[in-house]
Curated annotation (Swiss-Prot):
It is an enzyme of class 2 (transferase). This is 1-acyl-sn-glycerol-3-phosphate acyltransferase. The HXXXXD motif is essential for acyltransferase activity and may constitute the binding site for the phosphate moiety of the glycerol-3-phosphate. It comes from Cocos nucifera (Coconut palm). Belongs to the 1-acyl-sn-glycerol-3-phosphate acyltransferase family.
Length: 308
């Protein structure tokens, strides 16, 4: 069955206009009325340490986890009913993400701007930078139907969510050693081709502690070479301020999600893997605000390339 019908049930005009009113979501335009690049304003965010703000933050976090627990329990039950139908479970997993992710972002209350949404329904390998737990909420809400994600194999041991992740046919990677990781990537690529799916990956391989962009792993390029799917970069800004790693405090920092046009991989060659990684990493460096750019180390530029 074709899984490329990617429009989300939450993207109807009425619901979308309601969401824009609630979150301040808009697509910037220039004087001619055409979409234009909106400068990131997350760096201008000023923290508020008043006690009422701290209390509200605790309430929001509690509401997020309670809400997620309820929807996760409900969808685990649905998945068990749909056990004989793998593709139906993939679609239900996406539906769970759309409902839960949108609800969690509403609870957090961050103003959100989405740009380039015309590229959000392509069957592709979606990649995005990872600096906060909020990134996961956004991805859950925004990914098109027929999309699976990749996580470490240990996710199955996360109570409720791990079981739902597996039941929804999301992919897992064994990172215990390089050979196991390579074989896992091959299995992911085969599953994506066989089931006609899209895929979303955090190419850094982990969450940044500081919000600054980390070097990219090569796994997403290997998958692109095996599937020949285009790569759609998604640049997330401001999420590192909205919910910092290892913090119990959320903040109403403005968030921007920007989709870039698909990068075709039809003619890519395996000998140029390092070049492709550097090229896409440089795209992120160019479009992230100063607070999220990687620090320049001696002998290397901001994109991680050698200056020599």
């Amino acid at each position: 069955m074709d899984a490329s019908g990617a429009s989300s049930f939450l993207r109807g005009r009425c619901l979308e206009s309601c969401f824009k009113a609630s979150f301040g979501m808009s697509q910037p335009k220039d004087a001619a009325g055409q979409p234009s690049r909106r400068p990131a304003d997350a760096d201008d965010f000023v923290d508020d340490d008043r006690w009422i703000t701290v209390i509200l933050s605790v309430v929001r976090i509690a509401a997020c986890f309670l809400s997620m627990m309820v929807t996760t329990i409900v969808w685990n039950m649905i998945m068990l009913i749909l056990l004989p139908w793998p593709y139906a479970r993939i679609r239900q997993g996406n539906l769970y993400g759309h409902v839960t992710g949108r609800m969690l972002m509403w609870i957090l209350g961050n103003p959100i701007t989405i740009e380039g949404s015309e590229f959000s329904n392509t069957r592709a390998i979606y990649i995005c930078n990872h600096a906060s737990l909020v990134d996961i909420f956004l991805i859950m809400w925004l990914i098109p139907k027929g999309t699976v994600t990749i996580a470490k194999k240990e996710i199955i041991w996360y109570p409720l969510f791990g079981q739902l992740y597996v039941l929804a046919n999301h992919q897992r990677i064994d990172r215990s050693n390089p050979s196991a990781a390579i074989e896992s990537i091959k299995e992911v690529a085969r599953a994506v081709v066989k089931k006609n799916l899209s895929l979303i990956i955090f190419p850094e391989g982990t969450r940044s502690k500081t919000g600054r962009l980390l070097p990219f792993k090569k796994g997403f390029i290997h998958i692109a070479l095996q599937t020949r799917l285009p790569i759609v970069p998604m640049v997330l800004t401001g999420t590192h301020l909205a919910w910092r790693k290892n913090s119990l405090r959320v903040r109403p920092a403005p968030i921007t999600v920007k989709y870039f046009s698909p990068i075709k991989t039809d003619d890519w060659e395996e000998e140029k893997i390092n070049h492709y990684v550097e090229m896409i990493h440089a795209l992120y460096v160019d479009h992230l605000p100063e607070s999220q750019k990687p620090l320049v180390s001696k002998g290397r530029d901001a994109s991680g390339r050698s200056n020599s």
